[in-house]
Curated annotation (Swiss-Prot):
A single cellular component GO annotation: manchette
PANTHER family reported for this sequence: COILED-COIL DOMAIN-CONTAINING PROTEIN 42, COILED-COIL DOMAIN-CONTAINING PROTEIN 42 LIKE-2-LIKE-RELATED
Listed InterPro entries: CFAP_domain-containing, DUF4200
Keywords of the record: Cell projection, Cilium, Coiled coil, Cytoplasm, Cytoskeleton, Differentiation, Flagellum, Spermatogenesis
Record's protein name: Coiled-coil domain-containing protein 42
Lineage of origin: Eukaryota, Metazoa, Chordata, Craniata, Vertebrata
A single BP term in Gene Ontology: centrosome cycle
Family: Belongs to the CFAP73 family.
Function description: Essential for male fertility. Required for sperm development.
Coiled-coil stretches noted in the UniProt entry, renumbered to this chain: 39-146, 178-232
């Protein structure tokens, strides 16, 4: 039996099923009236008393059953409250564990990051030491070169004395400027040549593409001419076919209108049976068919349930 609150009819049905067969057996065991005591009135009073006692017993059992069901309902509600409290406690515990895991993960990430930074700093320090050694070696190499280039410095000093320049760095700057200008001119010439080559390549591709397009257009023109000739030769056939299509479309349109009208009539009948306002548009045939189908399905389910109950009554 369900733990929910039972209706009076359900309780009556339950007690009828539980005690009806037992009462029938007890009644069958009763002695025949013809073979009973000579005082039928006394016998009837005794049986009436037994019937009242049995009725009171059934009423008491019914009350006890109702109280038991109420107790079970209360226990069920208490279990629901305890279950909700347990779920809340589990959720809080999971949230607390998740927060601790997140803190632990952040701490581990921070420690890993600090170790990585320390390792990077050590690598950077080693790299700087190596660069310092390399710079010292470069300084020694440049110092040696400076001694080797001392003769060239003397030569440049003489050049300054016999030219328009006043300092050696002006001569060097002028030389660097001329070298840079020569490099720029050569680069510009190379870029110009590359542009010319690219333009030639684009022109060749353009000419080739246009030749291909002309050939494709000629082929397309020939194909369209053939299609035009075939269409012109079959114009009578297609005109008759078009007339047939129009006639068929008119019949289909008439049939569709008939179907929509019949569907609308059925929908209005269903709406009257349902006794409720529907917001279905008159032209929404699909929605109307859906509601008609649902109405038929509901009535079929009701009829099946009625037949099932009738069969149960027949068995009882």
């Amino acid at each position: 039996m369900s733990l929910g609150i039972m209706e009076e009819e359900d309780l009556a049905e339950y007690f009828r099923l539980q005690y009806g067969e037992r009462l029938l057996q007890m009644l069958q065991k009763l002695p025949n009236v013809e073979g009973a005591s000579e005082s039928p009135s006394i016998w009837l009073l005794e049986k009436k008393k037994e019937t009242e006692i049995m009725h009171q017993t059934m009423v008491q059992k019914k009350k006890m059953f109702q109280r038991r069901m109420e107790t079970l309902n209360l226990r069920w509600e208490e279990l629901g409250v305890k279950e909700a409290q347990l779920k809340a406690h589990i959720q809080k515990s999971e949230q607390f564990i998740q927060e601790n895991d997140q803190k632990r993960i952040r701490a581990m990430k921070k420690a890993n990051k600090e170790r990585e930074l320390k390792c990077q700093h050590m690598q950077e320090l080693t790299k700087r030491k190596q660069e310092m050694v390399a710079l010292r070696l470069e300084h020694q190499r440049l110092s040696a070169k400076l001694k080797d280039y001392y003769i060239f410095n003397k030569y440049l000093e003489k050049v300054v004395e016999n030219s328009e320049f006043e300092e050696i760095h002006e001569v060097i700057a002028r030389y660097k400027t001329l070298v840079s200008m020569r490099h720029d001119l050569m680069q510009s010439a190379q870029e110009g040549q590359e542009k010319i080559e690219r333009a030639k390549a684009r022109l060749a591709r353009y000419m080739e593409e246009k030749d291909d397009e002309i050939l494709q257009q000629n082929n397309e023109l020939a194909r369209l001419q053939m299609r035009f000739d075939r269409a012109r030769s079959n114009v009578i056939f297609w005109e008759s076919r078009w007339a047939h299509i129009q006639n068929t479309a008119a019949k289909k349109t008439l049939l569709l209108g008939t179907i929509k009208m019949a569907t609308l009539n059925l929908f209005q009948i269903v709406s009257k049976h349902l006794k409720e306002v529907t917001e279905v548009a008159l032209e929404d045939t699909h929605k109307q068919l859906d509601m008609i189908q649902q109405f038929i399905q509901d009535r079929s389910d009701i009829w099946a349930e009625v037949k099932k109950k009738e069969q149960q009554r027949v068995r009882i």
